[in-house]
Amino acid sequence: MHNGVLANSRKEERSGILNIADHLRPMGYRVGLTGKSHFRLGQQQFDGIDGFTGNANGDIAEYDLSGVRTYIRETQSAGSPFCVFICSVHAHHPWTVGDESHFPHEQLRIPPHYVDTPATRKAIAIHAAEVEEFDRQVGDVRAMLNESKLENDTILIVLSEQGIAMPRGKWSPYDHGSRAVCIAHWPGHFVPKKTSAIAMYSDFVPTFIDFAGGQSQVPLDGKSLKSLWLDERDKHRQSAFISNVHPFWQKAIVTEQYKLIWTGFPNEDHIHSNFASTKFFGKAWSEWKEASEKNRDVAAKIIRVLHPKRYELYDIQNDPYEVHDLAENGQYQNVKLGLLAELKQLMADAGESLEPKQPQGKEKERTRRRKKR
Protein backbone atom coordinates (compact mmCIF):
# COMPACT_ATOMS: atom_id res chain seq x y z
CA MET A 1 0.00 0.00 0.00
CA HIS A 2 1.16 3.55 -0.69
CA ASN A 3 0.10 6.79 0.94
CA GLY A 4 0.12 8.50 -2.47
CA VAL A 5 -1.59 11.87 -2.74
CA LEU A 6 -3.54 11.51 0.52
CA ALA A 7 -1.43 14.22 2.09
CA ASN A 8 1.17 16.46 0.51
CA SER A 9 3.09 19.55 1.45
CA ARG A 10 0.27 21.91 0.50
CA LYS A 11 -1.97 22.56 3.49
CA GLU A 12 -4.96 23.85 1.55
CA GLU A 13 -8.48 23.35 2.90
CA ARG A 14 -10.33 21.42 0.22
CA SER A 15 -14.07 21.94 -0.01
CA GLY A 16 -16.70 19.46 -1.10
CA ILE A 17 -14.81 16.41 0.16
CA LEU A 18 -16.92 13.52 1.46
CA ASN A 19 -15.68 11.18 4.16
CA ILE A 20 -16.51 7.48 4.38
CA ALA A 21 -19.45 8.19 6.70
CA ASP A 22 -20.96 10.45 4.02
CA HIS A 23 -20.94 7.48 1.67
CA LEU A 24 -22.02 4.67 4.01
CA ARG A 25 -24.64 6.32 6.25
CA PRO A 26 -27.12 6.87 3.36
CA MET A 27 -26.78 3.12 2.71
CA GLY A 28 -27.95 2.34 6.24
CA TYR A 29 -24.56 1.80 7.86
CA ARG A 30 -23.56 2.96 11.31
CA VAL A 31 -20.00 4.34 11.13
CA GLY A 32 -17.96 4.55 14.34
CA LEU A 33 -14.39 5.35 15.32
CA THR A 34 -12.23 4.81 18.37
CA GLY A 35 -8.66 6.04 18.77
CA LYS A 36 -6.53 8.34 16.67
CA SER A 37 -8.08 10.70 14.13
CA HIS A 38 -6.59 13.50 12.02
CA PHE A 39 -9.04 14.54 9.32
CA ARG A 40 -12.15 16.64 9.77
CA LEU A 41 -13.39 16.80 6.18
CA GLY A 42 -16.87 15.71 5.15
CA GLN A 43 -20.39 16.41 6.33
CA GLN A 44 -21.26 13.34 8.41
CA GLN A 45 -19.76 12.77 11.83
CA PHE A 46 -18.33 9.46 12.98
CA ASP A 47 -19.92 7.93 16.05
CA GLY A 48 -17.36 8.22 18.84
CA ILE A 49 -16.48 4.96 20.59
CA ASP A 50 -14.56 4.78 23.87
CA GLY A 51 -11.67 2.41 24.46
CA PHE A 52 -8.62 3.54 22.47
CA THR A 53 -6.60 6.69 23.10
CA GLY A 54 -6.43 9.38 20.44
CA ASN A 55 -3.18 10.82 21.82
CA ALA A 56 -0.45 9.36 19.62
CA ASN A 57 2.31 10.99 21.68
CA GLY A 58 1.25 9.62 25.05
CA ASP A 59 2.38 6.65 27.11
CA ILE A 60 -0.97 4.89 27.51
CA ALA A 61 -0.47 1.15 27.11
CA GLU A 62 -3.96 -0.08 27.92
CA TYR A 63 -6.96 -0.27 25.62
CA ASP A 64 -10.46 -1.61 26.04
CA LEU A 65 -12.68 -3.24 23.40
CA SER A 66 -15.83 -3.14 25.52
CA GLY A 67 -16.94 0.10 23.85
CA VAL A 68 -16.56 -1.48 20.41
CA ARG A 69 -18.46 -4.57 21.58
CA THR A 70 -21.32 -2.43 22.87
CA TYR A 71 -21.42 -0.36 19.68
CA ILE A 72 -21.59 -3.45 17.47
CA ARG A 73 -24.23 -5.04 19.70
CA GLU A 74 -26.38 -1.90 19.46
CA THR A 75 -26.11 -1.80 15.67
CA GLN A 76 -27.12 -5.45 15.48
CA SER A 77 -30.11 -4.85 17.76
CA ALA A 78 -31.18 -2.02 15.46
CA GLY A 79 -30.75 -4.24 12.40
CA SER A 80 -28.05 -1.97 10.96
CA PRO A 81 -24.80 -3.00 9.31
CA PHE A 82 -21.69 -1.36 10.75
CA CYS A 83 -18.30 0.01 9.75
CA VAL A 84 -15.94 0.52 12.69
CA PHE A 85 -12.50 2.12 12.58
CA ILE A 86 -10.22 1.01 15.44
CA CYS A 87 -7.36 3.47 15.12
CA SER A 88 -4.37 2.35 17.15
CA VAL A 89 -1.58 4.79 18.00
CA HIS A 90 1.02 2.01 17.67
CA ALA A 91 3.75 2.22 16.48
CA HIS A 92 3.80 6.01 16.79
CA HIS A 93 6.38 7.74 18.95
CA PRO A 94 7.39 7.84 21.77
CA TRP A 95 7.77 4.00 21.52
CA THR A 96 7.28 3.43 25.23
CA VAL A 97 4.82 0.54 25.01
CA GLY A 98 5.75 -3.13 24.65
CA ASP A 99 8.56 -5.38 25.82
CA GLU A 100 11.91 -4.38 24.34
CA SER A 101 13.54 -7.56 25.70
CA HIS A 102 11.69 -9.57 23.04
CA PHE A 103 14.09 -8.01 20.53
CA PRO A 104 17.68 -8.48 21.79
CA HIS A 105 19.79 -5.70 20.32
CA GLU A 106 22.65 -7.98 19.30
CA GLN A 107 20.30 -10.18 17.24
CA LEU A 108 18.72 -7.42 15.20
CA ARG A 109 19.29 -7.18 11.46
CA ILE A 110 20.29 -3.64 10.55
CA PRO A 111 19.01 -2.37 7.18
CA PRO A 112 21.91 -1.58 4.82
CA HIS A 113 21.01 2.12 4.58
CA TYR A 114 21.26 2.54 8.38
CA VAL A 115 24.41 3.17 10.39
CA ASP A 116 24.94 0.43 12.95
CA THR A 117 25.23 2.18 16.33
CA PRO A 118 23.88 1.35 19.82
CA ALA A 119 21.17 4.00 19.54
CA THR A 120 20.13 2.68 16.12
CA ARG A 121 19.66 -0.80 17.55
CA LYS A 122 17.79 0.66 20.51
CA ALA A 123 15.41 2.54 18.21
CA ILE A 124 14.70 -0.55 16.09
CA ALA A 125 14.06 -2.67 19.20
CA ILE A 126 11.63 -0.31 20.92
CA HIS A 127 9.81 0.30 17.64
CA ALA A 128 9.47 -3.46 17.11
CA ALA A 129 8.15 -3.84 20.65
CA GLU A 130 5.39 -1.38 19.90
CA VAL A 131 4.60 -3.09 16.59
CA GLU A 132 4.20 -6.28 18.63
CA GLU A 133 1.65 -4.46 20.79
CA PHE A 134 -0.24 -3.47 17.65
CA ASP A 135 -0.21 -7.13 16.60
CA ARG A 136 -1.70 -8.04 19.99
CA GLN A 137 -4.50 -5.53 19.45
CA VAL A 138 -5.28 -7.06 16.06
CA GLY A 139 -5.45 -10.50 17.66
CA ASP A 140 -7.84 -9.22 20.32
CA VAL A 141 -10.12 -7.72 17.66
CA ARG A 142 -10.20 -11.03 15.78
CA ALA A 143 -11.05 -12.83 19.00
CA MET A 144 -13.84 -10.33 19.69
CA LEU A 145 -15.35 -10.91 16.24
CA ASN A 146 -15.13 -14.65 16.71
CA GLU A 147 -16.74 -14.51 20.16
CA SER A 148 -19.53 -12.36 18.71
CA LYS A 149 -20.07 -14.89 15.88
CA LEU A 150 -19.26 -12.13 13.38
CA GLU A 151 -15.97 -13.26 11.86
CA ASN A 152 -17.61 -14.91 8.83
CA ASP A 153 -19.81 -11.88 8.16
CA THR A 154 -17.22 -9.14 8.67
CA ILE A 155 -14.35 -7.94 6.50
CA LEU A 156 -11.37 -7.19 8.74
CA ILE A 157 -8.76 -4.86 7.23
CA VAL A 158 -5.45 -4.25 9.00
CA LEU A 159 -3.26 -1.32 7.95
CA SER A 160 0.16 -0.52 9.37
CA GLU A 161 1.64 2.91 9.91
CA GLN A 162 3.52 4.21 6.88
CA GLY A 163 7.00 3.58 8.26
CA ILE A 164 9.47 3.86 11.10
CA ALA A 165 10.44 7.43 12.04
CA MET A 166 14.07 7.17 11.00
CA PRO A 167 16.02 8.62 8.06
CA ARG A 168 14.57 7.58 4.70
CA GLY A 169 11.57 6.21 6.56
CA LYS A 170 8.53 8.12 7.77
CA TRP A 171 8.24 11.58 6.14
CA SER A 172 10.06 10.37 3.02
CA PRO A 173 9.15 8.94 -0.41
CA TYR A 174 11.37 5.89 0.10
CA ASP A 175 9.72 2.52 0.65
CA HIS A 176 10.32 2.60 4.42
CA GLY A 177 8.25 5.77 4.51
CA SER A 178 5.57 5.21 1.88
CA ARG A 179 4.81 1.48 1.85
CA ALA A 180 2.31 0.14 4.36
CA VAL A 181 1.11 -3.33 5.22
CA CYS A 182 -2.45 -4.19 4.19
CA ILE A 183 -4.11 -7.41 5.35
CA ALA A 184 -7.70 -8.14 4.30
CA HIS A 185 -9.49 -11.07 5.99
CA TRP A 186 -12.90 -12.56 5.24
CA PRO A 187 -13.17 -16.31 5.80
CA GLY A 188 -14.75 -18.19 2.93
CA HIS A 189 -14.44 -15.25 0.55
CA PHE A 190 -10.82 -14.08 0.42
CA VAL A 191 -8.31 -16.70 -0.73
CA PRO A 192 -5.19 -16.58 1.49
CA LYS A 193 -2.39 -15.17 -0.66
CA LYS A 194 0.28 -12.51 -0.87
CA THR A 195 0.10 -9.98 -3.69
CA SER A 196 2.48 -7.42 -5.15
CA ALA A 197 -0.41 -5.49 -6.70
CA ILE A 198 -0.06 -1.73 -6.23
CA ALA A 199 -2.79 -0.03 -4.24
CA MET A 200 -3.23 3.27 -2.42
CA TYR A 201 -5.06 4.47 0.66
CA SER A 202 -7.48 6.34 -1.60
CA ASP A 203 -8.71 2.96 -2.85
CA PHE A 204 -10.47 2.10 0.41
CA VAL A 205 -13.47 4.41 0.07
CA PRO A 206 -14.57 2.93 -3.29
CA THR A 207 -13.77 -0.54 -1.93
CA PHE A 208 -16.09 -0.10 1.05
CA ILE A 209 -18.83 1.33 -1.16
CA ASP A 210 -18.42 -1.58 -3.58
CA PHE A 211 -18.66 -4.27 -0.91
CA ALA A 212 -21.67 -2.48 0.61
CA GLY A 213 -23.42 -2.73 -2.75
CA GLY A 214 -23.60 1.00 -3.40
CA GLN A 215 -22.42 3.58 -5.89
CA SER A 216 -20.29 6.64 -5.21
CA GLN A 217 -22.15 9.94 -5.12
CA VAL A 218 -19.14 11.81 -6.53
CA PRO A 219 -16.10 10.98 -8.70
CA LEU A 220 -13.35 9.33 -6.64
CA ASP A 221 -9.59 9.13 -7.13
CA GLY A 222 -9.47 5.59 -5.74
CA LYS A 223 -10.26 2.28 -7.42
CA SER A 224 -12.15 -0.52 -5.70
CA LEU A 225 -10.05 -3.44 -4.51
CA LYS A 226 -13.02 -5.82 -4.46
CA SER A 227 -12.12 -7.90 -7.52
CA LEU A 228 -8.48 -8.12 -6.38
CA TRP A 229 -9.47 -9.36 -2.94
CA LEU A 230 -11.98 -11.83 -4.38
CA ASP A 231 -9.16 -13.25 -6.53
CA GLU A 232 -10.86 -12.25 -9.77
CA ARG A 233 -7.67 -10.53 -10.94
CA ASP A 234 -4.07 -10.23 -9.75
CA LYS A 235 -3.26 -6.63 -10.78
CA HIS A 236 -4.74 -3.35 -9.61
CA ARG A 237 -2.72 -0.27 -10.61
CA GLN A 238 0.18 0.22 -12.99
CA SER A 239 1.75 2.78 -10.68
CA ALA A 240 1.27 4.98 -7.63
CA PHE A 241 2.09 8.66 -7.18
CA ILE A 242 3.89 9.60 -3.96
CA SER A 243 4.09 13.20 -2.77
CA ASN A 244 6.40 13.89 0.14
CA VAL A 245 4.79 15.27 3.30
CA HIS A 246 7.73 16.77 5.14
CA PRO A 247 9.11 20.19 4.17
CA PHE A 248 11.16 19.11 1.15
CA TRP A 249 9.87 18.99 -2.41
CA GLN A 250 10.07 15.34 -3.45
CA LYS A 251 7.77 13.48 -5.82
CA ALA A 252 7.93 9.83 -6.77
CA ILE A 253 6.31 7.18 -8.91
CA VAL A 254 6.43 3.50 -8.07
CA THR A 255 5.59 0.45 -10.16
CA GLU A 256 5.90 -3.20 -9.19
CA GLN A 257 9.50 -3.15 -10.46
CA TYR A 258 10.86 0.39 -10.17
CA LYS A 259 10.66 3.62 -8.24
CA LEU A 260 11.72 7.03 -9.56
CA ILE A 261 12.21 9.86 -7.04
CA TRP A 262 12.44 13.50 -8.13
CA THR A 263 13.98 15.88 -5.58
CA GLY A 264 13.40 19.57 -6.25
CA PHE A 265 16.21 21.05 -4.13
CA PRO A 266 18.98 18.46 -3.75
CA ASN A 267 21.50 20.97 -2.37
CA GLU A 268 19.45 21.54 0.78
CA ASP A 269 19.77 19.39 3.90
CA HIS A 270 16.96 16.84 3.71
CA ILE A 271 16.72 16.01 7.38
CA HIS A 272 13.42 16.42 9.19
CA SER A 273 13.68 18.63 12.27
CA ASN A 274 12.23 15.81 14.39
CA PHE A 275 15.39 13.77 13.87
CA ALA A 276 17.33 16.38 15.84
CA SER A 277 15.04 16.05 18.86
CA THR A 278 15.47 13.54 21.67
CA LYS A 279 11.83 12.56 21.22
CA PHE A 280 12.62 11.02 17.86
CA PHE A 281 16.01 10.11 16.49
CA GLY A 282 18.32 12.74 17.98
CA LYS A 283 20.72 10.43 19.82
CA ALA A 284 21.09 7.96 16.95
CA TRP A 285 21.51 10.77 14.41
CA SER A 286 24.29 12.25 16.56
CA GLU A 287 26.00 8.85 16.60
CA TRP A 288 25.66 8.61 12.82
CA LYS A 289 27.27 12.02 12.32
CA GLU A 290 30.06 11.26 14.77
CA ALA A 291 30.82 7.95 13.02
CA SER A 292 30.85 9.68 9.63
CA GLU A 293 33.92 11.70 10.66
CA LYS A 294 36.04 8.53 10.70
CA ASN A 295 34.26 6.19 8.30
CA ARG A 296 33.90 6.92 4.60
CA ASP A 297 31.01 4.47 4.11
CA VAL A 298 29.08 6.06 6.96
CA ALA A 299 29.77 9.51 5.52
CA ALA A 300 28.30 8.36 2.20
CA LYS A 301 25.13 7.20 3.98
CA ILE A 302 24.83 10.58 5.68
CA ILE A 303 25.18 12.35 2.34
CA ARG A 304 22.50 10.13 0.80
CA VAL A 305 20.13 11.23 3.56
CA LEU A 306 21.02 14.92 3.54
CA HIS A 307 21.49 15.47 -0.18
CA PRO A 308 19.58 13.02 -2.38
CA LYS A 309 20.30 13.38 -6.08
CA ARG A 310 17.81 15.21 -8.25
CA TYR A 311 16.69 11.90 -9.74
CA GLU A 312 16.97 8.49 -8.11
CA LEU A 313 15.91 5.22 -9.74
CA TYR A 314 15.65 1.94 -7.85
CA ASP A 315 14.80 -1.61 -8.81
CA ILE A 316 12.68 -2.24 -5.73
CA GLN A 317 12.18 -5.92 -6.55
CA ASN A 318 15.90 -6.62 -6.29
CA ASP A 319 16.89 -3.65 -4.13
CA PRO A 320 14.12 -3.25 -1.51
CA TYR A 321 16.24 -0.98 0.70
CA GLU A 322 16.92 1.38 -2.22
CA VAL A 323 20.69 1.56 -1.89
CA HIS A 324 21.70 1.03 -5.55
CA ASP A 325 20.72 4.12 -7.53
CA LEU A 326 20.30 3.36 -11.26
CA ALA A 327 19.41 6.88 -12.38
CA GLU A 328 22.78 7.51 -14.03
CA ASN A 329 23.15 3.99 -15.43
CA GLY A 330 22.88 4.17 -19.21
CA GLN A 331 21.08 0.84 -19.41
CA TYR A 332 18.13 2.29 -17.50
CA GLN A 333 17.69 5.65 -19.23
CA ASN A 334 14.54 4.59 -21.08
CA VAL A 335 13.05 3.38 -17.79
CA LYS A 336 13.98 6.64 -16.08
CA LEU A 337 12.60 8.91 -18.82
CA GLY A 338 9.43 6.87 -19.18
CA LEU A 339 8.73 7.00 -15.45
CA LEU A 340 9.50 10.72 -15.30
CA ALA A 341 6.99 11.41 -18.06
CA GLU A 342 4.37 9.29 -16.29
CA LEU A 343 5.12 11.01 -12.97
CA LYS A 344 4.60 14.45 -14.50
CA GLN A 345 1.29 13.31 -15.97
CA LEU A 346 0.13 12.02 -12.58
CA MET A 347 1.17 15.32 -10.99
CA ALA A 348 -0.78 17.27 -13.60
CA ASP A 349 -3.82 15.05 -13.07
CA ALA A 350 -3.60 15.75 -9.32
CA GLY A 351 -3.38 19.51 -9.88
CA GLU A 352 0.26 19.74 -8.79
CA SER A 353 2.76 22.18 -10.25
CA LEU A 354 5.49 20.64 -12.40
CA GLU A 355 7.93 23.23 -11.11
CA PRO A 356 9.60 22.49 -7.75
CA LYS A 357 8.46 24.96 -5.12
CA GLN A 358 9.54 25.59 -1.57
CA PRO A 359 6.73 24.56 0.80
CA GLN A 360 5.24 27.39 2.83
CA GLY A 361 6.61 26.01 6.08
CA LYS A 362 10.14 26.13 4.71
CA GLU A 363 9.71 29.67 3.43
CA LYS A 364 8.36 30.84 6.79
CA GLU A 365 11.27 29.20 8.58
CA ARG A 366 13.75 31.05 6.35
CA THR A 367 11.91 34.32 6.91
CA ARG A 368 12.18 33.88 10.67
CA ARG A 369 15.92 33.24 10.38
CA ARG A 370 16.41 36.35 8.26
CA LYS A 371 14.50 38.45 10.80
CA LYS A 372 16.73 37.21 13.60
CA ARG A 373 19.77 38.41 11.71
Spans of model-derived segments:
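Formylglycine-dependent sulfatase
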Residues: 1-312, 320-348, 352-358, 363-373
